[in-house]
Amino acid sequence: MLDKKQVRNVINDVLQKMGEKYASKEAIELVYNTGLVESKYVYLMQKGGNNVARGFWQIEPWTSVDAINNYLAYRPDLMKTVAKAANLDWKYFTDPNEDDWRFILTTNIAAQIAMCRVHYRRVPKRLPKTLDEQANYWKDFYNTAKGAGTPEKFVEMVKKYG
């Protein structure tokens, strides 16, 4: 597992580059805990199965392409901000494809953080404040009903490794 303080600092730095409203205490904690639960900050490729999900936040490439095409495309200022925060060429946002994003999500930690935050930003609800609220929010909007995770496992992982 990576050094917790360093991971939090990188998350803070990336989210600050996206803007103050993306870097609240709640956002930083939710993004940090999501990565912790998804990978323990150990795995860059989905363990077992087909290795579809990538990065510490276990984001599927199609999820990033969807976020770009159906969310960021309608928020060009935010799209530019995300590209800059992730240190990515604009072409990955103007013509996104899964192959490029598979590589980006495996190798670019700033892009992983930014896309995790964008994923949560799309949710039309306030960010959770408590660990239990985070666990349910993560399950409902990140891991989803189809995912193997549970709110109880989220809380357990954060208490054990966080």
Q: What do the PLM-derived regions correspond to, one by one?
A:
Residues M1-D13, L36-P124:
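Peptidoglycan-targeting cell-wall enzymes and recognition modules
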Residues T34, F56-I59, W138, V158:
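Generic structural hydrophobic/aromatic packing signal, biased to beta-strands
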Residues P124-T130:
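Short secondary-structure capping/junction motifs at helix and strand boundaries
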Residues Q134-G162:
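Long, amphipathic alpha-helical surface segments
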Residues K17-E26:
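Short, charged helix-capping/linker segments at alpha-helix termini
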Residues G19, V123-P124, Y142:
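Short amphipathic alpha-helical interaction patches enriched in hydrophobic/aromatic residues
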Residues S39-Q46, R126, N143-E152:
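Secretory-pathway/luminal and periplasmic proteins that interact with or process carbohydrate-rich
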Residues K25-N33, T130-W138:
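Alpha-helical scaffolds flanking conserved acidic
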